[in-house]
Amino acid sequence: MGQQETSRLFLALWPDPALRHRLREARDAWHWPRGATPVDAGKLHLTLHFLGEVPTGRLPELLDGFAVPFEPFRLALGRPVLWPHGIAVLEPLAEPPGLLALHARLSETLLALGLQPEARAYRPHVTMARRAGSVAAPEPGPAIGWDSASYALVESRAGRYTVLRDYPTS
């Protein structure tokens, strides 16, 4: 029996070009040590759920299944933090109830579709770099406002991200 083809998928808030530019500026405010790997500007996003490898044959079902109603919300990203293992992130100043409600609704949807949400606690963030060592986080600048009116199902393949479907607010 041959190996089943899979797609590496995640659900995310996907920034528009203007917001992506501001996120890139925030990423570039860090002074990265040698060996750090800043995230390419085209890949900056806020993950809602990482699904991992999913059988590609399930994509039609999942594309429709991930459409859940939600209310738009506003994020204020403005807390640069270095996480363990050299992960540099930009966290929101507060976790909007709308973001947490969307995350919870998508968790329920994952279970209904026979997929398992991650067990670890949800910590919303935008990853700025990996292998950042012990870099000092820059002084917080003005918060970056993110008016979220949609989320996306994204495929990661060979280092490239492709938005498979955008899900606007209800």
Positions of the model-derived regions?
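Histidine-dependent nucleotide/RNA phosphoesterase domain, centered on the 2H-phosphoesterase fold
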Residues: 1-170
